[in-house]
From Swiss-Prot:
<comment type="similarity">
    <text>Belongs to the arginine deiminase family.</text>
</comment>
<dbReference type="Pfam" id="PF02274">
    <property type="entry name" value="ADI"/>
</dbReference>
<keyword id="KW-0056">Arginine metabolism</keyword>
<keyword id="KW-0963">Cytoplasm</keyword>
<comment type="pathway">
    <text>Amino-acid degradation; L-arginine degradation via ADI pathway; carbamoyl phosphate from L-arginine: step 1/2.</text>
</comment>
<feature type="active site" description="Amidino-cysteine intermediate">
    <location>
        <position position="399"/>
    </location>
</feature>
<protein>
    <recommendedName>
        <fullName>Arginine deiminase</fullName>
        <ecNumber>3.5.3.6</ecNumber>
    </recommendedName>
</protein>
<keyword id="KW-0378">Hydrolase</keyword>
<dbReference type="InterPro" id="IPR003876">
    <property type="entry name" value="Arg_deiminase"/>
</dbReference>
<dbReference type="GO" id="GO:0016990">
    <property type="term" value="F:arginine deiminase activity"/>
</dbReference>
<dbReference type="GO" id="GO:0019547">
    <property type="term" value="P:arginine catabolic process to ornithine"/>
</dbReference>
<dbReference type="GO" id="GO:0005737">
    <property type="term" value="C:cytoplasm"/>
</dbReference>
<dbReference type="GO" id="GO:0019546">
    <property type="term" value="P:arginine deiminase pathway"/>
</dbReference>
């Protein structure tokens, strides 16, 4: 561990020290055309190439002296430490909507595996064909025999950004918007509670997965140690943002304000980080289509007051960002430039979804050449990673990482 604290994120751009990722696995090979939509994919990736691309991405980070941790490895280690596979399985199976005898049948089958194989099967999905045939006793079992899974695969797990997010020395363990992703944050909960790297750290949970409203990490940006920017999007509910703000104001000694920015509720703009990311002290990449021609959009400043929350509506997005960062001006670098066709194409392929690994230094997909050239022209050091298969899941370098530790900015 490189710092005393297991978690420390006080900006989007501080030197990245430790990051959590998930290498794409057999869960991607359980996607079929019939279930693309429900599993939140537009196409079926080629796993072998996807893994090569992800390995190159991880190597790019390691080459910059970033410690890369793997979700699947930490989850298995945490499960071994917890010494209670049955309780963990019961929770996972219950949230997979398996009940009655089928739940017991699935649990007994999975209990026969060691921790590594159990975690792998829970992530990849459990096909009905894997378990020996048994007599069906109930109507729902007989009517549902065409559906191939006892437990659905979790192909979005390689987007580790969304199930949880570190803010300061604490974390949000998120209630995901889509049912296909709800179980993902159970693995984060397991790791933080039982893995020896985290279990003795008394880590505050600012927002838990039992919350009634959805919140996802792709909408959570830590601008500085006093300010969190949260997108109200297709995946994050305004009520979740308000509850998060109240929790932070009551329990975090440093957070002074939460900014809520409203973005269109569309799949292409599913999270704030698909249209807006921080790349340097006063520089951001932005998809121009989220603002009107005057550069305006709805942004709300939430601050603590004597009567609870004080909410101030604003429209001048760029000015608000400059004010909270105490910068005279902010440079917005347009994803894809000024050409609306190029901008739309490169945003779709995550041209705005940069991962800052240090101030003025980012990782991007190689396919977004116009956006990458614009970043370089603005003085940003760009590391390009191969992306033909990774991009099929509709997420970029920021989406594929959960930063755990960054250096504090001086």
């Amino acid at each position: 561990m490189k710092m005393e604290q297991a978690l420390n994120i006080t900006s989007e751009i501080g030197k990245l020290q430790t990051v959590l990722v998930k290498r794409p696995g057999s869960e991607l090979e359980n996607i079929t055309p019939e279930y693309l939509e429900s599993l939140l994919f537009d196409d079926i990736p080629y796993l072998k190439m996807m893994q090569k691309e992800h390995d190159f991405f991880a190597k790019t980070m390691r080459d910059s002296n970033i410690e890369v941790l793997y979700l699947e490895k930490l989850a298995a280690e945490a499960l071994r430490e917890a010494n209670n596979k049955e309780s963990f399985l019961t929770k996972m199976i219950k949230e997979s909507n398996q009940m009655d005898e089928s739940a017991l049948y699935v649990r007994d089958y999975l209990m026969s595996f060691d921790e590594e194989e159990m975690i792998r099967k829970l992530m990849s999905g459990l096909k009905k064909s894997e378990i020996p045939e048994r007599k069906k006793k109930h109507l729902n079992e007989m009517m549902d025999e065409q559906y191939p899974f006892f437990l659905d695969p979790l192909p979005n797990l390689y987007f580790t950004r969304d199930p949880a997010a570190v803010i300061g020395n604490g974390v949000t363990i998120n209630r995901m918007f889509q049912p296909a992703r709800r179980r993902e944050s159970i693995f984060i909960e397991l790791i933080l509670k039982h893995h020896p790297r985290f279990s003795n750290q008394d880590i505050p949970v600012w927002s838990g997965r039992g919350e009634p409203f959805s919140l996802e990490g792709g909408d959570e940006l830590v601008l500085n140690e006093e300010t969190v920017l949260v997108g109200v999007s297709e995946r994050t509910d305004a009520r979740a943002v308000e509850r998060l703000a109240e929790s932070l104001f009551n329990r975090s000694p440093k957070i002074k304000r939460v900014l809520a920015v409203e973005i269109p509720e569309t799949r292409s703009f599913m999270h704030l980080d698909t249209v807006f990311t921080m790349v340097n002290f006063a520089q951001f990449t932005i998809h121009p289509a989220i603002q009107n021609q005057q550069g305006e959009l709805n942004i709300y400043i939430l601050e603590k007051s004597e009567n609870g929350l004080e909410i101030t509506p604003r429209r001048d997005f760029q000015r608000v960002i400059a004010e909270v960062l105490d910068e005279p001006e902010i440079d917005f670098i347009p994803c894809g430039g000024e050409d609306v066709i190029v901008s739309a194409r490169e945003q779709w392929n995550d041209g705005a979804n940069t991962l800052a690994i240090a101030p003025g230094e980012v990782i991007t997909y190689d396919r977004n050449q116009v956006s990458n050239d614009l970043l370089r022209s603005a003085g940003i050091k760009v590391h390009e990673v191969i992306s033909s298969e990774l991009s099929r899941g509709r997420g970029g370098p920021r989406c594929m990482t959960m930063p755990l530790v960054r250096e504090n900015l001086k």
